């Protein structure tokens, strides 16, 4: 399949070059993000929803992501002369009955804010919403988009490793693997 937002690709193929291609497809937008999430969890993921605190996406969240595959997604600030970034949470139901949630935050104003990201497994099925955003952004030790790799145990037999840059043209690459 093509390296475009909304696609599911082989997990081994996920990398910065693919995410840059997804990002460039958004064109000349001041605040945008390309997201790639590699499923090496041993579980199948089914899309639930994306909650946008600010910004939007023209892309439908890839519906099924099998083990060994990676999803590609994007987001951008709202069109027009509005001072917003692109901030949201993606939620996937996993075949074990739990929910994988991924936060991304690309602010408009870097004088006051930085890029942030987070990943967490919730018990049971939970759709992304404002409450989940607040929890992941303020209370669950998010990672700064600091051009470095970060790892964390997610519980439920899983761990994550991810990278986010510090630019307004952001890339977020996350690998979810068996612990």
Swiss-Prot record:
Binding residue positions for an N-(acyl)-sphingosylphosphocholine 2: 53-54, 85, 108, 113
Binding, an N-(acyl)-sphingosylphosphocholine 4: 133, 138
Span of the annotated motif Cell attachment site, crucial for protein stability: 144-146
Chief site of localization: secreted
Binding site for N-acetyl-D-glucosamine 6-sulfate: 51, 53, 138
Oligomeric and partner information: Octamer or nonamer in membranes. Monomer in the soluble state.
One Pfam entry name: Anemone_cytotox
Thermal dependence of activity, per record: Stable up to about 51 degrees Celsius.
Annotated binding of an N-(acyl)-sphingosylphosphocholine 5, by residue: 114, 144
Role played: Pore-forming toxin (PFT) that consists of a crown-shaped octamer or nonamer that forms cation-selective hydrophilic pores of about 1.5 nm (inside) and 13 nm (outside) and causes cytolysis. It causes cardiac stimulation. Also causes hemolysis (HC(50)=1.6 nM). Interestingly, the Phe-16 is crucial for hemolysis.
Additional record remark: This protein has been found to bind carbohydrates, since it shows a substantial delay in elution profile in size-exclusion chromatography. The carbohydrate pocket ovelaps with the lipid-binding module of actinoporins.
Site feature (Protrudes from one subunit (B) and inserts into the hydrophobic cavity from the adjacent subunit (A)) residues: 60
Protein name: DELTA-actitoxin-Afr1e
Binding locations of an N-(acyl)-sphingosylphosphocholine 1: 31, 79, 168
């Amino acid at each position: 399949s093509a390296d475009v937002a909304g696609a599911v690709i082989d997990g081994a193929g996920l990398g910065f070059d693919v995410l840059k291609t997804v990002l460039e497809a958004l064109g000349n937008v001041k605040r945008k993000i390309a997201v790639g999430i590699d499923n090496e969890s041993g579980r199948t993921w089914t899309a639930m929803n994306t909650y946008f605190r600010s910004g939007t996406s023209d892309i439908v969240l890839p519906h099924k992501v099998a083990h060994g595959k990676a999803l590609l997604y994007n987001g951008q600030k709202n069109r027009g002369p509005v001072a917003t970034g692109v901030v949201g949470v993606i939620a996937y139901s996993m075949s074990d009955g739990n929910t994988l949630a991924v936060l991304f935050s690309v602010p408009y104003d870097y004088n006051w804010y930085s890029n942030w990201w987070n990943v967490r497994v919730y018990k049971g099925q939970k759709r992304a919403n404002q409450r989940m955003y607040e929890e992941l952004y303020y209370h669950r030790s998010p990672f700064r988009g600091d051009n470095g790799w970060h790892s964390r145990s997610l519980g439920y037999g899983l761990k994550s490793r991810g990278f986010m840059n510090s630019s307004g043209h952001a890339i977020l690459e996350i690998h979810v693997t068996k612990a």
